[in-house]
């Protein structure tokens, strides 16, 4: 099961992770990556609008043989429903998925909340903030916390959107814009 890359940011990460994995295989290239991603999507019975919807469709409705999702969603499903129900399979290579968080100047200036907003942003990456993230199955980036949770989060070779795809703007235009590779792959289904 897979969310729709046209409507879900998380699905874009998933799609690009599969593409990146294919590129990094021996003799990997864009054509082989396109073939792999097309093969994956030929097996998707339903494209939900987002990751949580895909998880619900897969876990609760039993639709599909495989769920491609955020790491935390997979761990949560296994912990809630039992290790005998699902196996989490990690690829040898994936994307460093870091959804953006930012202080929006126009908003904080209008509301006078810059210090609070910046404190929150700083807290997210503090040791304490990363402890909270890790307890909720998000892979921590703080070195101390990452070490404490190393058994929960297997080591992965991670690539970035910038290095592999030339940044989000280029990836969006190439893969997810109307007529892009996702449309070429999925509309042929």
Q: What label would you give each PLM region?
A:
Residues 1-20:
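A conserved helix-loop-strand patch within extracytoplasmic ligand-binding domains
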Residues 1-5, 41-45, 106-109:
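Second-shell loop/turn segments in exported
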Residues 4, 71, 136:
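Short secondary-structure boundary segments
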Residues 7, 20-28, 107-117:
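Short helix-loop capping/hinge motifs at secondary-structure junctions, enriched
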Residues 16, 20, 38, 56, ...:
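Solvent-exposed, polar/charged alpha-helical surfaces in well-ordered, non-transmembrane soluble domains
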Residues 97-101:
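Small-molecule pocket liners
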């Amino acid at each position: 099961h897979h969310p729709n890359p046209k409507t879900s940011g998380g699905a874009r990460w998933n799609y690009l992770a599969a593409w990146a994995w294919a590129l990094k295989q021996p003799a990997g290239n864009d054509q082989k990556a396109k073939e792999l991603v097309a093969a994956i999507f030929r097996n998707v019975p339903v494209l939900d609008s987002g990751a949580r919807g895909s998880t619900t469709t897969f876990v609760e409705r039993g639709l599909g043989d495989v769920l491609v999702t955020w790491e935390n969603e997979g761990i949560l499903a296994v912990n809630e429903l039992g290790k005998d129900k699902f196996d989490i399979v990690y690829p040898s290579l994936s994307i460093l998925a870091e959804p953006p968080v930012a202080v929006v100047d126009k908003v904080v200036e209008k509301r006078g909340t810059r210090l609070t907003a910046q404190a929150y942003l700083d807290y997210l990456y503090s040791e304490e903030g990363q402890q909270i993230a890790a307890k909720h199955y998000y892979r921590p980036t703080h070195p101390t916390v990452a070490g404490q949770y190393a058994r929960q989060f297997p080591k992965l070779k991670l690539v970035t959107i910038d290095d592999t795809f030339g940044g989000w703007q280029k990836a969006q235009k190439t893969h997810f814009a109307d007529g892009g590779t996702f449309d070429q792959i999925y509309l042929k289904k």
